[in-house]
Design a protein with these regions (language model features):
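Substrate/ligand-engaging "lid" and interaction regions
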Residues: 2-435, 442
């Protein structure tokens, strides 16, 4: 019986190609709603009778999926916001797929709310969820957070609690997720035509492209007598080890390869598949630095992932998927947001710290960090690099300049391994010069 009701915030490729898709395919939902402020996107799906298309990149081609019976609502439109609040009050599952956790409480000139006459009107996602829960008719509600932050659920719960008050833990639970599913929006008409992609809906020059991979982890649901309507997610009592495997494994190596690809002048990640030298660098960083440290840290769990064989399978699968010609991920997308990705505790330097903690030299991760600095300098304007740090050609940097850039990237934060981290990156410069020279001849 389709007794569940689903509401999703944000309608990008993960919401559309994962949460809404799985809700629809499960047959367990009587109503599926997506809240999206892009009116052009809302209109296109609505005009297509609530149906949209997702292109699924497999190892040997692309499949087209059609998802039906989706209600699109724009929370910035007063009438639709009221409908959304009614749906939220009945929702058994809610999923947030926003650009970052910073968007939970955005949405009004007055933080959290705007006022129309005497009636406060909720605008932020946290406010909308809080007001929906206040009027809840559902026996229970779980809220999936998919913002690629290992504390997303706690952050959203705190934001909602400030507006709602104490939540009933017997009826409401906020869940973290580990989503290793790569995806993108293709907006180039030429690429859409050449690759024979199907657009999201007729009249909209955009296409969702997601990979086939579907092993999604979520916090275990603890609400009594409640079974999630989306049944394919794998529940874990403690997600932190798997979140670290994604950040220091998947995300770190993806960024490393993306930065090196950008420094070498590549445009597509699939170009790396035939460059055995670069792929071996990625593989060594994955297995001998990230993987070796994670296995030492989490071997006590006795989970297959944190064994040599399990992590090797995980790494080899990801290296193939990262360079999948049917996903055709762009180097520009993978190497974007370089300032955040080179933060002290982020994917590159966070992995290096983890390796050093377990007595492992992070020489390949350091190469990725140096390549990231090269990307930063090549796109100094785009990344708002201060004028006094725009040193030009990364090949001509001396150690002092590399250190200045790293200190700026870390926002003057430090850690016990700071000097070692900086030295590893400085030492990686010559190796990157040699690698990019070889790339030019490849």
């Amino acid at each position: 019986m389709a007794a569940h009701i689903f509401t999703g915030f944000g309608f990008g490729p993960i919401q559309a190609g994962l949460f809404v898709k799985e809700a629809f395919q499960s047959g367990n939902f009587s109503r599926i709603v997506a809240a999206e402020i892009d009116q052009e996107l809302v209109n296109a799906v609505r005009a297509n009778n609530g149906s949209y298309y997702v292109n699924v990149a497999k190892a040997d081609g692309i499949d087209i999926l059609k998802i039906d019976h989706v209600e699109m609502l724009n929370p910035n439109v007063a009438e639709e916001r009221e409908i959304l609040l009614q749906v939220l009050a009945e929702s058994t599952e809610i999923a947030t797929c926003l650009p970052s956790v910073d968007f939970y409480d955005r949405g009004s000139a007055i933080p959290g709310r705007v006022f129309t006459g005497w009636k406060p009107v909720p605008r932020s996602v946290a406010s909308l969820i809080a007001d929906g829960l206040k009027s809840s008719k559902a026996k229970a509600t779980i809220i999936y957070t998919a913002e690629n932050n290992n504390r997303a659920a706690e952050i959203l719960e705190q934001a909602v609690t400030k507006k709602f008050g104490t939540l009933s833990r017997e009826k409401v639970q906020f869940l973290n997720t580990v989503i290793g599913k790569m995806s993108r929006v293709v907006a180039n008409p030429t690429e859409i035509a050449e690759r024979k992609l199907v657009t999201i809906a007729p009249g909209l020059q955009r296409a969702f492209l997601v990979e086939e991979f579907n092993r999604i982890l979520a916090t275990r649901t603890r609400i009594s007598n409640f079974r999630p309507g989306i049944e394919v997610f794998i529940e874990k009592d403690d997600l932190l080890p798997f979140e670290e495997a994604k950040l220091f494994g998947h995300n770190a190596i993806h960024a490393l390869l993306g930065f090196i690809a950008a420094a070498c002048g590549c445009s597509r990640m699939t170009e790396l598949a035939d460059n055995q030298r670069i792929m071996q660098i990625g593989r060594a960083a994955f297995l001998q630095e990230s993987g070796a440290a994670l296995i030492k840290k989490y071997a006590y769990l006795r989970d297959e992932l944190f064994t040599e064989a399990g992590f090797r399978d995980y790494a080899e699968d990801l290296l193939q998927r990262m360079t999948n010609p049917y996903l055709a991920d762009t180097v520009a997308r993978v190497s974007r947001d370089v300032v955040r990705k080179l933060g002290l505790n982020e994917r590159i330097f966070g992995t290096m710290q983890l390796a050093l903690e377990y007595g492992i030299e992070p020489t390949n991760m350091a190469l990725g960090a140096m390549a990231g600095i090269a990307v930063l300098l090549m796109k100094a304007e785009e990344n708002n690099l201060p004028t006094d740090l725009r040193f030009g050609d990364w090949r001509k940097l001396n150690d002092a300049k590399i250190e200045k850039i790293i200190i700026w990237l870390w926002n003057s934060q430090t850690c016990k391994y700071a000097e070692q981290l900086i030295k590893y990156v400085q030492n990686a410069q010559e190796r990157l010069k040699e690698l990019t020279t070889d790339c030019a001849d490849f």
